[in-house]
Amino acid sequence: MCLQNLLSILCFVLAISFGYVSAQKCVDSMFFRPNGTYDTNRHLILSNLASNVSSRDGYYNGSVGEGPDRIYALGLCIPGTDPKVCDDCMQIASTGILQNCPNQTDSYDWRSQKTLCFVRYSNSSFFNKMDLEPTMVIGDLNSGLFQGDLAAYTRTWEEFMNSMITRVGRTRYLADISPRIGSARIYALMQCIRGISSMECETCIRDNVRMYQSCCNGFIGGTIRKPVCFFRWDGSEYLGAFGDTPSLPPPSPDGKTISTGAIVAVVVSVVIFVVLLALVLVIRKRRQSYKTLKPKTDDDMTSPQSLQFDFMTLEAATDKFSRNNKLGKGGFGEVYKGMLPNETEVAVKRLSSNSGQGTQEFKNEVVIVAKLQHKNLVRLLGFCLERDEQILVYEFVPNKSLNYFLFGNKQKHLLDPTKKSQLDWKRRYNIIGGITRGLLYLHQDSRLTIIHRDIKASNILLDADMNPKIADFGMARNFRVDQTEDNTRRVVGTFGYMPPEYVTHGQFSTKSDVYSFGVLILEIVCGKKNSSFYKIDDSGGNLVTHVWRLWNNDSPLDLIDPAIEESCDNDKVIRCIHIGLLCVQETPVDRPEMSTIFQMLTNSSITLPVPRPPGFFFRNRSNLDPLTYGSELGQSSSKSIPYTIDSASITRVTPR
């Protein structure tokens, strides 16, 4: 027994000693080149992490850079921390990681410095990832072993910790005080990062508790830290985490219970507090009700005050929504150029009153876009819900849409050769790459898995440098982390860009966006709309069929837009056509993920698989059976045979 205790003490002291040498955990599995792009990005994101965390209620995650030089970082402070104290703690933790982990691609630190804060960075996204290793055990050398009835202490310790474990998952944070053990108490704090589930939080904390029981049983204080959770226990208060926790009175010497008067006083105080709290909440709700939509489901919008614009400001910015400021028609409404009082140019999207499902699309767009931050996505600046108006305010993107440059002015039926000539092969290739990065962010790197469901040329805006920005999230759907596909009774989007499983069965997933992106790649290469190919040959009339024929005839270069013939790289063009055909394969499982597409575009040494036949491939118009074809598109057999997917009609939704 003595030997076992001695080994436990030795184990704990060694762990503590190591912990005091370095509070940071530098993961030594991968390294980066000092002073390179990754190192620059690391300094950039960590130097701004403290201000981002302290200004965002104590929690922030984000990324900087592209490709292999991209770095992800997360920071948090425990709830209720003063912003200045949080900022100081984050500064110390960030600086410590930079100094003590000179070239590791993954490091983390739980810092106890007046408060508890956490910093982690990595070369791969970890925001929703359950990481239980590596572990740090750090303790208080001065606390020592519990002096008293060790069996009673251990029993109380285990019961108390198990009780906390069952509660911590709901909020990811818990600080509590145990019942008395003689004159002693246990002060325990548990914290998980927000990205993991409640069950994962409980699992991580439980693993820390087991580690204490196996190596450090009986010690009064210490901490056990993992990349996604933190556990500390001690014999006295710390970090100001227990200031609001009421202290229980010591047991009465004569063993009598608390007096009736004391109980009545406590009950009356609690009742008064609850009544006052209810009154405050009712008054606040009434004051703010005119600014928010009445919630109907759990998915309805919750709107931060900083995003709200008043109607008069937007009316003045757009000169009362004058025709001269009209930029065009977007999904479910008209878009106007505006100038805010601070001289910021904006695009103001005014939802039309007869837009059918517009209200839901409006809320959908606000909820989703407000959470997204990526250079290849149009940034949402705010919204307005006054006077029965529903308005979205976006950053202004000066060069209109990709559709305008590739296919011309739809209203005037004109194609300006000077506009098309601005899209040389280098720019088109960069546009394909930018859209890839934007979709990769939506599908994989954002906090939610988001499916756009309406990827097409008119929803790709071009900034002043002709960089693409994905726009119009009215059709978008967000998925849980563990969800891979869904279905809908109402098929929405643009025909010609929809995959077969969506058109016929209403099933959609990230592979739906991949299919649409494949069609868009082929349009960018050839400079023609998908719907313009029904006159070219005897096929059923779409771009996918035309490209598949050229591919099988070993003549893919016949697809190239004459405007880029002299400037294009034939190898890259063929590779893009190949990737486009992989994206439009009939079976979703055959289509590559956006992460794979990104690798295919950036690494020419990757061998591409042979594409399978695409969806909506028609051999000859005369072979089409009206009944079969109509039913495949989800139409009544009484409908006439559509020659293009763009002209098909499944619902009364007007293609945008």
UniProtKB/Swiss-Prot annotation:
| InterPro entries (alphabetical) | GNK2, GNK2_sf, Kinase-like_dom_sf, Prot_kinase_dom, Protein_kinase_ATP_BS, Ser-Thr/Tyr_kinase_cat_dom, Ser/Thr_kinase_AS
Q: How does it sit in the membrane?
A: Single-pass membrane protein
Q: Where in the cell is it found?
A: Membrane
Specify which residues bind ATP according to the UniProt entry for this protein. Answer: L327, G328, K329, G330, G331, F332, G333, E334, V335, K349
- Is the Phosphoprotein keyword given for this protein? yes
Sugar attachment sites are N35, N52, N61, N103, N123
Q: Which residues lie on this side of the membrane: Extracellular?
A: 24-262
Instruction: Name all Protein kinase domain ranges.
Output: 321-606
* Main location (coarse class): membrane
Annotated active site? D454 (proton acceptor)
Q: Which residues form the signal peptide?
A: 1-23
Give all Phosphoserine modified positions.
S458
Entry's Gene3D superfamilies? Gnk2 domain, C-X8-C-X2-C motif (3.30.430.20), Phosphorylase Kinase, domain 1 (3.30.200.20), Transferase(Phosphotransferase) domain 1 (1.10.510.10)
Keyword Lipoprotein present in the record's keywords: the answer is: no
Sites where Phosphotyrosine occurs are at Y394, Y502
Q: Could you identify this protein by its name?
A: Putative cysteine-rich receptor-like protein kinase 32
What is the species of this protein?
Arabidopsis thaliana
